[in-house]
Amino acid sequence: MRRQAENFGAEFLLAEATGLKQEDGFFVVRTPKGDFRAHGVILATGAHPRMIGFPGEAEYKGHGIAYCATCDGEFFTGREVFVVGGGFAAAEEAVFLTKYASHVTILIREPDFTCAAKVAEPAKQHEKITVLTNTEVVRAEGDSLLRSLTYKNNQSGEEIVYKAKEGDTFGIFVFAGYEPATELVKGIVEL
């Protein structure tokens, strides 16, 4: 595809796009290497993990709260881990995390997993996994590290507080899907 585009005169430049605007019938792409004008722009901005937004999530992101089991799972070797989510990724990554964690608790806000039963079954049957349905995170707290998690049953309203052992921490892995990285085109393209 690249060769074909180059045959038609397309130029490929490697730079981070930091801004985009329309000006005099052109798109102007702002980069650290300068501004570039074009009749058309193809965007491949990617996506990032969706944050749920519970109190403490932003504060402990990277300090106990993670979004990638294969990237960060090993940091929680021998520790308790919570997985937040009920979809495909949550079910599969919870099973993966059992390689490192002492125990995995999955918190699902719905009455059951939302992924295919065949995907959910290994998580439901795993001896190191507990599945709590109708359950939502209330808040995550700590000091420089994550120390406690409060979650509640959204049917009964009962709140449960998990506290890490004295001087220890634990992990929370959030699997709530992905958000497209569209900040660059806000106000230019209808989203």
Tell where the protein language model's regions lie, with residue ranges.
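Short, conserved acidic/polar surface loops in the N-terminal third of protein domains
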Residues: D24-F27, G40, M51-E57
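Helix-enriched interaction subdomains in cytosolic or periplasmic regions
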Residues: R37-A38, L43, H48
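Hydrophobic anchor at the start of a short beta-strand
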Residues: V41, V81, V104
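Redox-cofactor binding/interface segments in oxidoreductases and associated redox assembly factors
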Residues: L43-T45, V83, V174-F175
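Aromatic/hydrophobic pocket-lining residues that form π-stacking "cages" and hydrophobic walls in ligand
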Residues: M1
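Glycine-rich dinucleotide-binding loop and its adjacent helix/turn
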Residues: A47-F88, E92-Y100
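A Rossmann-like FAD-binding core segment of flavoenzymes
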Residues: A5-N7, E11-D24, V28-T31, D35-A38, ...
